[in-house]
């Protein structure tokens, strides 16, 4: 509170720093959702699963794996529609709001689920390390990708923070104060 910043070095109006920071975070979170990357990755995953033989069919013939892919597609489509509504609002000059938290939360969780299903499709080959691929070509770096995806839900505001934003701004809930 005792910081002195020369007027010529200020960005925007005095006392509005947090408002500007929140606006930047909303845009950052929308981008971190990575929905276009997830759409491409999911299509690649489905193609890869079609190339893996399991029993008398492919991995995509496995009802359990197919159900996981279907759930992921549904979540991705619903999140994409949220993004499109958000973009339409922004195009109309409206501010982004808690939608950016929803997009960041759902988008990064979807990215993690894609990585997890890639590891599942790769089987033991996902753990292979080094420059020489072992097993299916897409399994190279599978486990590393999965483990690195853990931080997706941390940067740009941890998932717990996003849930708090959603609870407060969408659902009107407040945190109970325990003594």
Question: What do the PLM-derived regions correspond to, one by one?
Answer:
Residues 1-79, 152:
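Glycine-rich beta->alpha junctions and the first turn(s) of the following alpha-helix
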Residues 41, 68, 99, 145-148:
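Residue-level recognition of specific faces of alpha-helices
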Residues 54, 63, 77-134:
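C-terminal helix-coil-helix/basic helical segment that borders enzyme active sites and/or dimer interfaces
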Residues 11, 31, 35, 59, ...:
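Hydrophobic alpha-helical scaffolding
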Residues 5-6, 26-27, 51, 84, ...:
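Short, well-ordered loop/turn and helix-capping segments at boundaries between secondary-structure elements
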Residues 18-20, 48, 81-84, 107, ...:
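Tryptophan-centric aromatic hotspots in well-structured domains and transmembrane helices
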Residues 15-27, 32-35, 125-179:
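Glycine-rich phosphate/cofactor-binding loops in nucleotide/flavin-utilizing enzymes
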């Amino acid at each position: 509170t005792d910081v002195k910043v020369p007027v010529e070095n200020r960005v925007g109006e005095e006392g509005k720093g947090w408002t500007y920071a929140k606006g930047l975070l909303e845009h950052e979170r929308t981008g971190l959702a990575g929905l276009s990357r997830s759409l491409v990755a999911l299509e690649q995953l489905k193609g890869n699963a079609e190339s893996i033989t399991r029993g008398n069919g492919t991995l995509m013939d496995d009802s359990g794996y197919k159900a996981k892919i279907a759930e992921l597609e549904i979540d991705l489509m619903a999140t994409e529609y949220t993004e499109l509504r958000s973009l339409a609002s922004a195009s109309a000059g409206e501010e982004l709001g808690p939608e950016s938290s929803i997009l960041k939360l759902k988008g990064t969780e979807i990215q993690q689920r894609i990585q997890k299903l890639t590891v599942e499709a790769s089987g033991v080959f996902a753990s292979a390390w080094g420059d020489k691929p072992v097993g299916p070509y897409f399994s190279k770096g599978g486990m590393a990708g999965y483990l690195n995806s853990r931080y997706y839900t941390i940067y740009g505001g941890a998932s717990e923070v996003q849930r708090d934003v959603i609870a407060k701004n969408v659902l009107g809930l407040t945190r109970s104060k325990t003594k």
